[in-house]
Structures are given as structure tokens and as C-alpha cells.
Curated annotation (Swiss-Prot):
Protein family: Belongs to the RuBisCO small chain family.
Misc. remarks from the entry: There are four genes coding for RBS in Arabidopsis thaliana. The basic functional RuBisCO is composed of a large chain homodimer in a 'head-to-tail' conformation. In form I RuBisCO this homodimer is arranged in a barrel-like tetramer with the small subunits forming a tetrameric 'cap' on each end of the 'barrel'.
Protein name as annotated: Ribulose bisphosphate carboxylase small subunit 2B, chloroplastic
GO cellular component: apoplast; chloroplast; chloroplast envelope; chloroplast stroma; cytosolic ribosome; plastid; thylakoid
GO biological process, one term: reductive pentose-phosphate cycle
Superkingdom classification of source: Eukaryota
Amino acid sequence: MASSMFSSTAVVTSPAQATMVAPFTGLKSSASFPVTRKANNDITSITSNGGRVSCMKVWPPIGKKKFETLSYLPDLSDVELAKEVDYLLRNKWIPCVEFELEHGFVYREHGNTPGYYDGRYWTMWKLPLFGCTDSAQVLKEVEECKKEYPGAFIRIIGFDNTRQVQCISFIAYKPPSFTEA
């Protein structure tokens, strides 16, 4: 005798309950909100600061090669480099020294549109300086790289390991043989 099992499925329905929501009637009148307004007869309330700006002339970009951040400025001194490195350390970025022997600037090798290998990838000098707390450590690595490769362009980058992005990059050294034209 074979035993058989019967299964029955019962569908239970419940009546849909209608929820009463009032239709949107627009914004309320502004008369119900207390607002104090300042009279616009005062010159200091104008948003433009045109009268207080002292303009600074930029480094001329004509005939200059485009490098990285700060590329149109004059070369940075050791003190200015140390300040930039201190800035990236304050932001908790990892400093890294990189060098390029042939092209220290953006160039187009594989067509006229930006491509994968068009002057954007440099050789890393040693490993990134994880745990670095002093700009002197980074500048020491730049000096070592200069001694090893005196004809190379050297740059310092700041890498944010939380967001996995490069946040800053600037030229630390241009070879003496380099001409701008």
C-alpha cells in the first residue's frame, strides 16, 4: 500500500486598506515664516570683491611644456618643495617619488587624442614612503634620485590610500639639459 500525501495550498486574501493622504497643494505662503531682511543700500553687501582683489600675473604658458600641478610656475625652491610635501603629509597622503628619463611632460605618441601611454606613467623611485612623517625624508629621496639619474625629471606625488587616488603631483626637479621650447 503506497502512502500518498496530499498537499493543498490555500490562498488567503485580505482586503486592501485604503490610506488617506491629502494631495500636495504646493508650498505654504512665505508670510507665515518670520524673516528679517537687510537693506541693500550698503556697499559691503555686494557679493563682488572686485575692489579688494590684488591680481597676480601668471607664468606665461606660451612656449612652456605642461608638466603637473604648478607646472607654469617658476621652479620650486627646496623650502617651497618642503612646504608642498608638508601639505600632502598633513592631508594623510602617502608621498612617492617618481622619475622619467625621456619625456617629463605630457606628449602624444600614439595619435592626437589622449591615450593610455601618452606621457602619464613614470617609473617609481623605490617604494612609496609609507609612514613618512617629515618632508626631509622625501627630499632626501629626491636627492638620491638626482644622483642616480641626473638627466631625469623627478616628481613627487601624494597618494590617498583610503580613496585609492593620486591627489597631488608636482615636478621636484628638471634636468639641467632641459629647455622649455
